[in-house]
Amino acid sequence: NDEVPPRRAYLEDFIAPTYNVKFIFSETLKDDAATKTFIENCIDSGVDAIIDMKSASGQMAQLCMDNGLVYTINGNYTQHPELLTTDYTNFAGCIGANNAQVGSLFGDWLEENASEDGSEGFLISTSLAAQGNTQHVEITRAILEGLQQKYGITYTKSIDDLIASSETTNVENDKNILITLYPGSPNKDTWLPGVSALIQTGQYNTFLSAGQTYNQSATVVDEVEKSFGINIKVASVGALGTTLETAFNTKDSSGNSSVDLVAIKTVSTQTAAMFAATYNALVSGAECRACRGEDGLPVYFTFNFIPITSAEQLTEMSGWDAKETGNWIANKDFVDQMLVTVNPDVTSDDINAIMQSLSYEKIKEMMG
């Protein structure tokens, strides 16, 4: 996806020479067995740490601990509770999205952009929320709560039960507002035909997604807009890159962008947090206060998403976190403040405060 090239460039072209470290990158890993094989090969190559973007499990943490490697993951503890309940002394922590903040972006957008009576119809792609994906759960929850607050509606079922449904669900409510939940991964072959069939009814003028779907759904959305003479508002998550640029700069039949809100992660800041946790564990041990909370447990380091709502805003961000420009949001000053070698008194709370302080306005100021 669009995150991979800039993440690798950030590590290879900026982090490696700046902090005198080296990286070995895997090919695409299809399962845990492939991850295990890659880690074993890295052990044979003499690496000091593993940053796991794929499997993130106690099995991998144990393998690393048995061989003296620091282990850091991209993910969350909801899906991998053993990383909190088992004493992996080499485990540097978990880096993931500030899910409540991501969800609030969707809630705020709905408050500003949904109609006064809710007559447009809302189709919500819940992605992997039913399987427990924390980010997808929080976004779906924020959307349902946002609709509830805006229209003063009461759902027949609890929001938790609605989120947990693995079937297409029309959300019963006392105002009879059309709200439909469509679960499933957009990477599955069955996702697009299913969501297309719903959009083609012409009943939904707002399409919200807990995952990145605007690239898959753009064609059918445009076709339905032409057929019914409507403008379907689209809100999703995504990442800086050509896919996002195409989405905002592609106009539908009414002259509107094919997407209205995309909540993006800034790849360099996420990657900087993973590097900082790993580097601090290598220098001071994974049980240092830069990697552990006051309770002595591993920390969930979080990063904020940034809301993009126009092609003009995206133009202002041109060149940010781009391999071609090397103009990284998480520059040396930003990374240094999270490292024990530069800031010996830094704690895990300090690092989280640094990460959570980032907003579009703050980043714009940082980038000059």
Label each residue range with its predicted role.
Residues 1-368:
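A residue-level marker of the well-folded mature domains of exported/periplasmic proteins
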